[in-house]
Amino acid sequence: MNAANAVKYPELKIKLESYDSTLLDLTTKKIVEVVKGVDVKIKGPLPLPTKKEVITIIRSPHVDKASREQFEKNRHKRLMILVDVNQGAIDSLKRIKIPVGVTLRFSK
């Protein structure tokens, strides 16, 4: 094993968040393809509970408080765990183009 592909982390967790579930699924597929290309074991993508934000607004500007409208935002989450990550895998993960609506968080 050479120094460029030496094991850097025994485990690397990637947490993905997005308000658009289709964008999130496309991004997880991209990451899975890239990781399988560099021979790193992967656990997931594991779907985490969706957070639901509900906002209630009164429709009328003056009277009639009973008339209300509700809006909701759903935050979708996925967790991926990479095992025995080498420097080549980290470099290939850095090159992935992530869409604007997706947030990535890395942790050990």
UniProtKB/Swiss-Prot annotation:
Pfam families named in the record: Ribosomal_S10 (PF00338)
Entry-linked InterPro entries: Ribosomal_uS10 (IPR001848), Ribosomal_uS10_CS (IPR018268), Ribosomal_uS10_dom (IPR027486), Ribosomal_uS10_dom_sf (IPR036838)
Entry superkingdom: Bacteria
Recorded family membership: Belongs to the universal ribosomal protein uS10 family.
UniProt KW Ribonucleoprotein keyword: yes
CC per GO annotation: ribonucleoprotein complex; ribosome
Subunit description: Part of the 30S ribosomal subunit.
Organism: Mycoplasma pneumoniae (strain ATCC 29342 / M129 / Subtype 1)
Name of the protein in question: Small ribosomal subunit protein uS10
Its job: Involved in the binding of tRNA to the ribosomes.
PANTHER family recorded: 30S RIBOSOMAL PROTEIN S10 FAMILY MEMBER (PTHR11700)
GO molecular function annotation: structural constituent of ribosome; tRNA binding
GO biological process: translation
